[in-house]
Each structure stands twice: as C-alpha cells, then as structure tokens.
Amino acid sequence: MGNKLKIINDPIYGFISFPFESIYYLIQSPYVQRLRRIKQLGLSNLVYPGAEHTRFSHSLGAMYLMTKALDGLRQKGYDITEKEYEATLKAILLHDTGHSPFSHCLEHLFFSCHHEDISKLIMKKLNCEKEVIEIFENSYKKRFLHQLVSSQLDIDRLDYLTRDSFFTGVSEGVIGTERIMNMFSVYNDELVIDEKGIYSIEKFIISRRLMYWQVYMHKTVVGADCLLKSILQRAKDLAIINKLDIKNYPISLNLFYFLENGTQEPNNIEALDKFILLDDTDIWNAVKTWSLHSDKILSYLALSLMNRSVGKMYVKNSEYTGEELQERHVSLFEKYKTQGFSFDAIKRYFATTGKMHNRAYSFNDEQINIWYKNGEIKGIHEASDQLDEIFLQKEIKKFYYHEI
C-alpha cells in the first residue's frame, strides 16, 4: 500500500497520517464509511449553515489527536506497547460507529441501549482484538488508555469541541487542545493533568458548558429534533396499522423494519444488520416522500421540516403544570381546527414537552485530577480557583413546550 493512502487532509489539523495499515483498512470498512453519511450535529445546520461536518471527519480527527496524546505520553517515559498504541487508535476510530442517523436525536428509536453498546457490537463484528474492546469498555489493565477514549477529559471531547466550534463559527468552543494534551501524565495507571495545565482545563470545562447552550441545546435545534421525532412517531403509528403505504410512498426497507417492529434489543442480529445500513439519507428520503403522503398529518409535519418551519419553543425555568399544558394544547388545537386534526392528534404529534439540562462537570464519573510536583493529587474542584464545587455541581435545567 502506498503512503499516499495513509495521508488525509483535515480542515482542522492539516495533513494527518496514521502509522498502521490495519487502521487504513478499518477506515475503508463499510462501518466507518457509513459515518460519512451521518452529520456530527444532526439538524444544527438549520441554525448554523456551516455545520455540515460528519461523524467520519470527527472520528479521523479524534484518532489523529490520539496519536499525538500517546506520543506525548511515550516521550514522558510511560510504557505503551505497539499493540496497546494500535488498539487505542482503533478504539477511538470506532467509538462512534454505533450512532444512529441524526446521532443523538434518534438514538433510542432503533435500539433500547446507548450508541456505545452498538459500537462495541460493531467492533466484535469487525473481529477487533480483545485489547480494543477492553480499552473501549474500561476493562483493560492500563485504565488511562480508556480514559483517553472516554472520560470527562477525553480525546473525543477535545476534537468535537474544536471541530464543532470551527464549523458552526461559535468561538466559545475554542480550547487549548495542544496544551491540554501536552499536560497529560499518568499516575497509578490513571490519567492526570500536570499542575501547569489547570487553566487550560478550566477553559475546557467552561467552553463545553457554553457550547451546550449555544449549539447542542440551541432552542431551534431542539425544536427541529422534536419535529423529526414527531414525523417518525406518526410514521410508526401508521406502519403498525398498515397505513404507511410504502407501495405508493416507498422508503428504505431497513427504516421500515424499525417503524413496523419498533425499538429492538441490541442482541437482535437481524436488527443490527439493518441498522448499520441506515444513515441520514434514509431519513431525509423518507421525509421528502412523506411530504406528499395522503395522510395529512404526516405530510404536514414532513413538509414543515423540509421548509424549516420547525415551530415555536417556549422555555421556562420551572416545569409546566397540567393546567398550563392544557391551555397550550387547546390554543394549538384552535390553530389547526380548520384542517380537521383531532385534539388527540394535536397533543401526540404537534406538541412536545421536555427538559434541557446540562452540568459542567459530573461528580458521579471519574474526576479530572491535577498532579502537583510534590506528588499530591487534587480533583479539579479542589485545585481550581475559578471552578469551585458549587459551580461544578450546579445543574442548569430548562423546561420547554414545543409546538409545530
């Protein structure tokens, strides 16, 4: 294989190369190539037109950063064998292969588990070495390798914050990725940060919180997600009673399988085989087809999404009471009464209630630890002057009522 096959031009990091041929062959596999057809930020491009980047570019970028992180740890004298190095690269490359179309928005439409569980099943289908799976699932003896793949300060987050900031144009996501990785060290097989890196970690935590509210939980994006879920809910309801009519309104048979049979368990091999053939294009093709459907509710919802008429979001700091919800439902029903939609249909497909919440830092997960020259280890909540325990523990909650 020529070297040119191992070089990729990334818009964030420039020309990047990978040291193992096995990595190249994994990239060429259908499971990784599928990620080209799944956008990293789902429907966020309805708000940020530049957010067209994919899970594929993120996975490659994360793998590149992993080579930098592992090389840095090796230069500091930490023992990472070639087999461990290669296995860790494979784990980060494949970490998102279990994502559904439109990523987190539709995660539980297909399977009753998280995408990480599907990623692990795909690793097994690819006959990955046991070290790859052990590192991914946190059962490998050197725990810092898993922490680089998945933790509160992992390579995944370092890449997606940088990449999402670049493509959305939201500068709050810019972090000192290079600086943070240079501060990585290992203590008792755990990933730690040299004390000089504390300010970069503070910036990282604050940037992630800001990106959540400005991008990931932007109210228009959440509203678009609600609309897409309503479309698929209506399609499922029609499929169950044999009224989706795929003969006259053809859609992907793999998508129809899930609409007809509902959410599946991850041990369903047939469902997994159909799932890995699905991507964003299957959903968009269905939405375009349904915009002409004879079912008025389905066609109205589908056409609304196609034309970016995603409805209104009403956000408040406390939960909606039953009385408030009823009042909004009645008002919405009056709006559509002339179109013949029933009150029950309005509640089921045209109105969605939910909660948006975000915490800058979780004390339930492994902590970000700072390593001082005197050998002392402190959690970031103890070491930081800016991020005390009260700030880090505070969970911001917003409750919404979305109407089409």
Question: Where do the protein language model's features map onto the residues?
Answer:
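Alpha-helical scaffold segments that flank or form the walls of functional sites
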Residues: 90-91
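Short active-site segment of divalent metal-dependent hydrolases/proteases
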Residues: 94, 98-99
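Histidine-centered, transition-metal-coordinating active-site segments
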Residues: 1-87, 101, 105-404
